[in-house]
Amino acid sequence: MTDTTVEAPATPRLKVKYNEQIIPELEKEFKYSNPMQVARVQKVVVSMGVGAAARDSKLIEGAVKDLTLITGQKPKITKAKKSVAQFHLREGQAIGAYVTLRGDRMWEFLDRLLTLALPRIRDFRGINGHQFDGQGNYNFGLTEQSMFHEIDPDSIDHVRGMDITVVTSTKDDKEAYALLKHLGFPFKEN
């Protein structure tokens, strides 16, 4: 008989950094008595609105394909709730897609975003540090999908932007800012 051992998948390096370095730093900074009080990233939502899909239904397929390549997870398609004649939109028509990332996939996506994608943006000076929603969540947008290595620039049919929401466990923007700064988010210095 042969012994077969199954190796556990490697822990994402950003998660290791969070557990080993960031938690102790935030405990000192905010004087927490319990490590469970430290802010943590709960989920990341990546969404792509495809308004032009109202006229051409094939555009949504490209958005789904791009989001699948970028996040490693199949997106959920969002549909119009109401018909709007001015936008040539019918109720139930596909108009966008989104992915909710949790766990290791979330950590891997954040790592790729911070180390590979954001530095590839032309004339990048940092992201705005004032886009918190008052509840400890951070929202920002990217203008094109080609900055991710998973997307082949030659195969892009349309340039699509995306919105990224980082949901944290804290309800305070100051704590969320400190968490994201420690994780490596390149905020602009104002």
From Swiss-Prot:
InterPro entries per record: Ribosomal_uL5, Ribosomal_uL5_bac-type, Ribosomal_uL5_C, Ribosomal_uL5_dom_sf, Ribosomal_uL5_N
Gene3D superfamilies hit by this protein: 3.30.1440.10
GO MF term (any one): rRNA binding
Keyword Nucleus recorded: no
Keyword Cytoplasm among record annotations: no
BP terms from Gene Ontology: translation
Superkingdom, natural source: Bacteria
Keyword entries, A-Z: Ribonucleoprotein, Ribosomal protein, RNA-binding, rRNA-binding, tRNA-binding
GO CC terms of this entry: ribonucleoprotein complex; ribosome
Pfam families (UniProt xref): Ribosomal_L5, Ribosomal_L5_C
Family, similarity comment: Belongs to the universal ribosomal protein uL5 family.
Subunit composition and interactions: Part of the 50S ribosomal subunit; part of the 5S rRNA/L5/L18/L25 subcomplex. Contacts the 5S rRNA and the P site tRNA. Forms a bridge to the 30S subunit in the 70S ribosome.
Functional summary from the UniProt entry: This is one of the proteins that bind and probably mediate the attachment of the 5S RNA into the large ribosomal subunit, where it forms part of the central protuberance. In the 70S ribosome it contacts protein S13 of the 30S subunit (bridge B1b), connecting the 2 subunits; this bridge is implicated in subunit movement. Contacts the P site tRNA; the 5S rRNA and some of its associated proteins might help stabilize positioning of ribosome-bound tRNAs.
Record protein name field: Large ribosomal subunit protein uL5
